[in-house]
Amino acid sequence: MPDNLKLLTKDYFNRHPIKDISAARFEYSMLLHPEVMDIADEVIPELQAKGLSFPDDSAAVAAVEKEDETARLLRMLRKTLPPKANRVLLEKVLPREEEVLPEIQRMILKEFSDSTIENCTRYLVRCRTNCSEWIIQNYNSIREPYARSMLCLVLGFRAGLDAIPFLMQQVEVFETCFPSETFDQGPILALSELKVRFRTV
């Protein structure tokens, strides 16, 4: 599908620009540079020593670390946790893919919580199974536009060039149906990532 890559021209991104601030942009940055959060974890104690205060996430992190039952870990994925606790949780569920992935997929189809969708997005980007085909096949069953936008982002990291027309279509849908929102940024950032992944020197 190399011809699909030719659709992603400079003119296309001028007409559908990447915005400086959006939920998808934040999530994309975290997926692309997860080490940023690790650096933040190292810097926070220094800032605390200088008198700055931050929410204490140690209890949430400890609760995730001591939990070993998959069903309870999955319930935690539905909660809003501090960023560090979320990262610990993701590392615990990734090796349990056979049990966890079907439940993640069920959550995506049923859940409306933004934090749950964000956790599921991070999981799908990093799990061994490439769920691109599943996302496209089940896309119309996902009712929440925010969830759809985030799943488009997953396609940017995991799908092939054959996903480009689908993502371009979603950009048009979001821009038409939700002109005052930034849902279009999910598929736009996905297209940008696909262009980077498959560009030829």
Where are these regions (language model features)?
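TPR/TPR-like (Sel1-like) alpha-helical repeat modules
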Residues: 171-175
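Structural detector for internal amphipathic alpha-helices that build alpha-solenoid repeat scaffolds
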Residues: 10-16, 23-34, 42-65, 75-79, ...
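Short sequence/structural elements of tandem HEAT/ARM alpha-solenoid repeats
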Residues: 102-106, 133-138, 162-170, 200-201
